[in-house]
């Protein structure tokens, strides 16, 4: 339980950290400006463009970042509509293109992408549902990246990070194969997956039974670490991102990772009463640290 610090605390932020923090400020400023737009669809599209523009600027050029993409498999099945897709244009042809609409092969997809203005319970349900449908498609083994593709999401805000992570962890326990690989909450945290080698938590990308839902408590450096993870996906087999990491030793050396213990997750997923009691502890403690809320929740369901 509680937080696992990967290394000792770093000192002053690097130039790279400062640059990415400025990108994050720009994103939040654009988000606040778009709040003045009354038309909901236009407002949502504006916020999608903002984050996709940043990704297009910063990710390796092997990856195309595009909206309006239809993903199909070899059986002619189509994926649900995602806000955007990260896919490989260096090796894979398009199947169809007409103005802003593009049809691509499932095997060319690195990750399907969802954008949320504010991350709540219904948003998480939507992300998991779309991930399940994407992962049920027939993916041939000759893809450029992961088989099946990954799912990631970006949220500008989250009113209760503790509750959101609790919901993420519970759904991940209940539907392991439908779990998104990474959710970014700007300037707050990253929700991801890990496995244990007995003494250490190791980050994993592809969801599977037995994975451990984790929260990287990244705060103002969330965007930097998100770009790092996406770049690592895009450069599989390369040591490029190891070098990228060294440009910000201070942030990576101070990463704290939180996860729930297995007895807690087993209890809340096997008992509706325990689930309700535990969830109330996170719902009513948005201002507390997740460690404190977790300690209260364990007590409420009799785990001490």
Specify the residue positions occupied by each region the protein language model found:
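Intrinsically disordered, low-complexity Ser/Thr/Pro/Gly-rich regulatory segments
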Residues: 2-81, 86-304
């Amino acid at each position: 339980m509680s937080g696992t610090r990967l290394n000792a605390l770093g000192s002053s932020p690097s130039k790279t950290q400062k640059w990415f923090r400025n990108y994050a400020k720009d994103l939040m400023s654009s988000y606040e400006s778009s709040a003045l737009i009354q038309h909901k669809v236009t407002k949502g599209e504006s916020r999608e463009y903002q984050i996709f523009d940043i990704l297009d600027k910063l990710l390796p050029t092997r990856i195309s970042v595009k909206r309006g993409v239809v993903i199909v498999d070899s059986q002619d099945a189509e994926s649900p509509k995602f806000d955007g897709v990260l896919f490989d244009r260096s090796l894979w042809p398009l199947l169809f293109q007409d103005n802003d609409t593009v049809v691509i092969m499932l095997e060319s997809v690195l990750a399907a992408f969802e954008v949320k203005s504010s991350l709540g319970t219904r948003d998480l349900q939507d992300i998991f549902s779309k991930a399940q449908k994407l992962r049920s498609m027939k993916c041939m083994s000759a893809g450029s990246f992961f088989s099946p593709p990954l799912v990631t999401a970006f949220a500008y805000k989250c009113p209760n990070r503790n509750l959101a992570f609790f919901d993420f962890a519970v759904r991940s326990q209940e539907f392991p194969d439908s779990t998104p690989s990474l959710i970014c909450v700007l300037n707050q945290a990253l929700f991801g997956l890990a496995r244990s080698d007995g003494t250490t938590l190791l980050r994993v990308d592809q969801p599977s039974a037995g994975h451990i839902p984790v929260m990287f408590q990244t705060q103002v450096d969330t965007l930097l670490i998100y770009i790092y993870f996406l770049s690592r996906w895009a450069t599989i087999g390369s040591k490029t991102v190891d070098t990228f990491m060294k440009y910000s030793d201070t942030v990576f050396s101070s990463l704290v990772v939180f996860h729930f213990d297995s007895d807690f997750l087993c209890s809340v997923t096997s008992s509706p009463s325990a689930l309700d009691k535990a969830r109330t502890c996170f719902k009513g403690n948005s201002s507390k640290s997740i460690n404190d809320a977790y300690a209260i929740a364990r007590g409420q369901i009799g785990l001490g």
